[in-house]
């Protein structure tokens, strides 16, 4: 982890990148660099996805038919692949979101002090 503005960057838990990419595409189609930038911006620079992780994740999601990709021309006139969430991807996002909420509650429970004997 590296330091940035006094906060340490958060390493993504294994398996969360797909969820984060699906969530990002929920807000609209984006090319790979745009996905990485949105993740970084929406996490206040805490999450930074490198291309060595992002593009394999995008290809994996495309193989699962959770996203589609089409060629387009970017604002600076370069050819880019634009990724979009599919209906199957929206369903999977709901599943992933539910899992994340369960995990968050479980971790929050572990963080609380244990109940004293006789307390409920």
Regions found by a protein language model. Give the residues of each.
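Intrinsically disordered, low-complexity serine/threonine- and proline-rich regulatory segments
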Residues: 1-15, 96
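Amphipathic alpha-helical dimerization/coiled-coil segments
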Residues: 2-3, 88-120
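N-terminal helix-turn-helix DNA-binding core of bacterial DNA-binding proteins
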Residues: 9-53
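Short, structured helix-loop boundary elements
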Residues: 10, 51, 79-82, 97, ...
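A cross-family signal for key residues in well-ordered alpha-helices
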Residues: 23, 37, 59, 94, ...
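Short, hydrophobic secondary-structure boundary micro-motifs
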Residues: 48, 70, 118-119
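Basic amphipathic alpha-helical segments that dock to polyanions
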Residues: 54-61
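Beta-hairpin "wing" of winged helix-turn-helix
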Residues: 62-78, 84
């Amino acid at each position: 982890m590296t330091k940035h503005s006094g906060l340490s960057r958060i390493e993504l838990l294994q398996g969360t990148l797909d969820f984060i990419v699906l969530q990002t595409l929920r807000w609209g189609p984006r090319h790979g660099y745009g996905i990485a930038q949105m993740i970084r911006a929406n996490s206040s620079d805490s999450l930074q996805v490198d291309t060595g992780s992002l593009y394999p994740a995008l290809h994996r999601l495309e193989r699962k038919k959770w996203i589609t990709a089409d060629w387009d021309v970017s604002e600076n006139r370069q050819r880019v692949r634009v990724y979009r969430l599919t209906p199957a991807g929206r369903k999977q996002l709901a599943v992933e979101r539910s899992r994340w909420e369960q995990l968050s509650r479980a971790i929050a429970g572990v963080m609380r002090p244990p109940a004293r004997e006789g307390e409920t």
